[in-house]
Amino acid sequence: MSENRIRIATRKSPLAMWQAEFVKAELERIHPGIVVELLPMSTKGDVILDTPLAKVGGKGLFVKELEVAMLDDLADIAVHSMKDVPVDFPEGLGLEVICEREDPRDAFVSNLYKSISELPLGATVGTSSLRRQCQIRASRPDLIIKDLRGNVGTRLAKLDNGEYDAIILAAAGLIRLKLSERIASFISAEESLPANGQGAVGIECRINDERVKALLAPLEHLETRYRVLAERAMNTRLEGGCQVPIGAFAEIDGDEMTLRGLVGNPDGSEIIEGVITGPKTEATQLGVALAEELLSKGAKTILDAVYAKA
């Protein structure tokens, strides 16, 4: 392998390609003369669009083929949305870099209404996320929530075709695809706690590839890593897959981190919440401690029921 060449495995969706192009541009900016190649690939998660993710294996479906490419030395790195990255990595691979986070909030998207509170009784909202479903149903049990799969463009087209009165998407994806004008309003973390890692981009590579790790190192954003570590640690302790009604959101003020978390029944009938504050350098411990608090309040009963249905 040439010392100044990196191959990036990426999904083919516009958002995945944006993320890969972002990393490519950053590497080229930091390392003049480097040759960065993109290897677009289809994953099972991109192909199976007619079934809710929870029923076909969760969001790990979006990364497996990329990981195989790295293990087979067809690619050097893979670029992921952190909210799609499973807790465990295949032997020989690891998460080397977490880039600076984009806006982590959910976005309310509608051609007719400005916010969830403006929606009329019985309006139809599109989202496949159990996390979003439980929080919307808790505040607006009258709303009809329908599954929504596909890439961002497909989801917006379904809204424009009148299949939904509104849809909920990650704000970061719309911002990155220069579709901010489609956002009717940003949903505050208080109203809809984001998914762990939402808005952050991670780079996975072979853990023994020191050449690639050295090239990637300048892309690391330490504050984002602390935040995402706390959120993922909470999710891991809860034994949460990617398609679960779990919200986690960490914020940092100076050296102090505040982590909020929730587990909700997808029907909105019960939401268990907690908050913890401590040193940002103890991000993982804070995540585990908050998970323990949620479990002590009954989170396991909710999660067991969700897994039983999946």
From Swiss-Prot:
A biological-process GO annotation: protoporphyrinogen IX biosynthetic process
Keywords for this protein: Porphyrin biosynthesis, Transferase
Pathway stated in the Swiss-Prot or TrEMBL entry: Porphyrin-containing compound metabolism; protoporphyrin-IX biosynthesis; coproporphyrinogen-III from 5-aminolevulinate: step 2/4
Residues where S-(dipyrrolylmethanemethyl)cysteine is found: 242
Reaction(s) the record says it catalyses: 4 porphobilinogen + H2O = hydroxymethylbilane + 4 NH4(+)
Keyword Transferase annotated: yes
CC cofactor: dipyrromethane
EC number: 2.5.1.61
Top-level EC class: transferase
Cofactor note: Binds 1 dipyrromethane group covalently.
Free-text function comment from the UniProt entry: Tetrapolymerization of the monopyrrole PBG into the hydroxymethylbilane pre-uroporphyrinogen in several discrete steps.
Additional detail: The porphobilinogen subunits are added to the dipyrromethane group.
Similarity-based family: Belongs to the HMBS family.
PANTHER family the record matches: PORPHOBILINOGEN DEAMINASE (PTHR11557:SF0)
HAMAP family: Porphobil_deam
Protein name per UniProt: Porphobilinogen deaminase
Originating species: Shewanella baltica (strain OS155 / ATCC BAA-1091)
